A protein has these predicted regions:
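Short glycine/serine/threonine-rich phosphate/pyrophosphate-binding segments
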Residues: 18-19, 75-80, 188-193
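Gly/Ser/Thr-rich active-site loops/lids in small-molecule metabolic enzymes
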Residues: 172-217
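Short glycine-rich anion-binding loops that position phosphate/pyrophosphate groups of nucleotides
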Residues: 14, 74-76, 99, 185-187
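ATP/NTP phosphate-donor binding region
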Residues: 1-67, 108-124, 133-143
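Gly/Ser-rich helix-loop-strand patches that form or flank binding pockets
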Residues: 79, 84-94, 101
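Structural signature of FAD isoalloxazine-binding scaffolds in flavoprotein oxidoreductases
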Residues: 117, 200-202, 208-213, 222-234
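Catalytic core of DAGKc-family lipid kinases
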Residues: 98-177
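ATP/nucleoside-binding phosphotransfer catalytic cores, i.e., glycine-rich phosphate-binding loops
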Residues: 151, 156, 167-170, 216-251
Length: 251
């Protein structure tokens, strides 16, 4: 692979508050001859202005980027995951958060960015989920998820019942707080907290783990990624059921 023309630096403005880490990274990469631009995963008014660093629009700049460096925790990478996947741009995480399972570098390792000049990279391909909500045969919501899709009862203090199918037929039902449908990358997240299995992140499986099941016989499932998983909420439960992908806003 040839040397990249552009690297996007994408600091979480609430983690790299004064842009110290991103600015130092930009200095190193500029010294190595890379074209660098600074974009934000989400907007914060005035961020970067005191340093005179222009903030560019991510949706525009990523179209011809070769790499994005995310400064934050796992949540920052998850927030960027859909945009990265749609543009087929790899991400390198520099951990500034409380969790850094997806990050490769810590702030005291920035000099290692100089190794990018050889562009001798090992890129891990991670499986993602294509998530849709279908009502009366019509798709009303669609997204992709790097970690998981969580179907839950929200804050309502009651048990919800969910029926789970594959294209081959009925699989199981869950009575409890909901279910986590996870990728291998997400197996160390909410899925693990429910008692689900930990899977090597580069594997290709779909994990199904009930949340606080009402039955002691409920168990997790590890399925081939070729399956299409259907989760149905009976009519009596539908208004109490919520979907959240990668910890985002509930639908």
């Amino acid at each position: 692979m040839s040397k990249p023309k552009k690297i996007i630096l994408c600091p979480n403005p609430y983690r790299d508050k004064d842009m110290t880490v991103a600015a130092r990274s930009k200095e190193i990469l500029d010294q190595e001859g890379f074209e660098t631009v600074v974009c934000l995963p989400f907007q914060k008014e005035g961020y970067g202005a005191e340093l005179g660093v222009p903030i560019q629009q991510l949706d525009r700049e990523i179209k011809r980027a070769d790499l994005l460096i995310a400064f934050g925790g796992d949540g920052t990478i998850l927030h960027l995951a859909k945009t990265l996947a749609m543009n087929r741009v790899p991400v390198l995480g520099i951990n500034l958060g409380s969790l850094g399972f997806m990050s490769e570098l810590e702030p005291d390792e920035l000099e290692r960015l100089r190794d990018l000049k050889n562009w001798d990279l090992s890129i891990e391909n991670r499986m993602m989920l294509d998530v849709s909500v279908v009502r009366d045969g019509r798709t009303v919501y669609n997204t992709i998820a790097l970690n998981d899709a969580v179907i839950s009862k929200g804050s309502i203090a009651r048990v919800v019942r969910l029926e789970i199918y594959t294209e081959e037929g009925f699989l199981t039902w869950v009575g409890g707080d909901g279910v986590v449908i996870s990728t291998p990358t997400g197996s160390t997240g909410y899925s693990m907290a429910t008692g689900g299995p930990i899977v090597e992140p580069t594997a290709r499986n779909i994990l199904i783990s009930p949340i606080c099941p009402h039955s002691t016989r409920s168990s997790s499932y590890v399925l081939d990624p070729s399956h299409v998983i259907h989760v149905k909420a009976p009519d009596a439960n539908r208004k109490f059921v919520y979907l959240s992908s990668d910890g985002g806003k509930a639908f």
